[in-house]
């Protein structure tokens, strides 16, 4: 009986890891598409719309993704950084994502899912604290937004999104993106089928080519200029309120207010 229970636990762990890896690869493709077209897909809308509107993402100076970021005691599943300008005073958004996978999605209030949620919130709080120790110096406002995401193992549907209150810190957005990328320990594999592209022009025949498989950290969706690196600590509030969105019922964007990060992002583009 004990051996059977161990095998069941191992199979569940392997299934969760496979789901994590598939979701990572899907995020890379979805975010690249949103950056190009200015429209979020069904997976990214509950995660990003309230923080960075799709049209704002399209005009951002730099967007990067890093997976399994090693912060020492914690390792957030995904960190997305968005840069809105150049220089040490450029504003940006840093989204920390903790991913939880579910075999069954009908009931999101089971005891196991509640334990997953509590554990994920603790992980996010610790990750924010640890990330503060790696912040490079800079005067740019960075919105640090921790997000807990429940995903169905079948279909990779986003079931529920829970947010901690965002924090505003000051750093260099470009250097922060480079620092986080160096700490990443996982890069989604690129298959031959997905890397094959077909170039079509009006005057020449189409030609197929293959991109080389990357072995290091995943490359930013748009390149950001590096600068000098250092570390500076920042303070976070001890308590943070959670905002939960059930994506299975339907995603409803929050109204714009002073506490809404969407209003903060919109203010970046307001006329001076």
UniProtKB/Swiss-Prot annotation:
Keyword Membrane attached: no
Expression induction: Expressed late in the infection cycle.
Entry annotated with the keyword Lipid metabolism: no
UniProt GO cellular component terms: host cell Golgi apparatus; host cell nucleolus; virion component
Location(s) in or outside the cell: Virion; Host cytoplasm; Host nucleus, Host nucleolus; Host Golgi apparatus
This protein's UniProt keywords: Host cytoplasm, Host Golgi apparatus, Host nucleus, Late protein, Virion
Coiled-coil intervals, chain numbering: none
Classification via Pfam families: Herpes_UL24 (PF01646)
Protein role: May participate in nuclear egress of viral particles. Plays a role in the dispersal of several host nucleolar proteins including NCL/nucleolin and NPM1. Since deletion of host NCL/nucleolin negatively impact on nuclear egress, UL24 supposedly acts on this process through its effect on host nucleoli.
Similarity comment: Belongs to the herpesviridae UL24 family.
Name recorded for this polypeptide: Protein UL24 homolog
Species of provenance: Equine herpesvirus 4 (strain 1942)
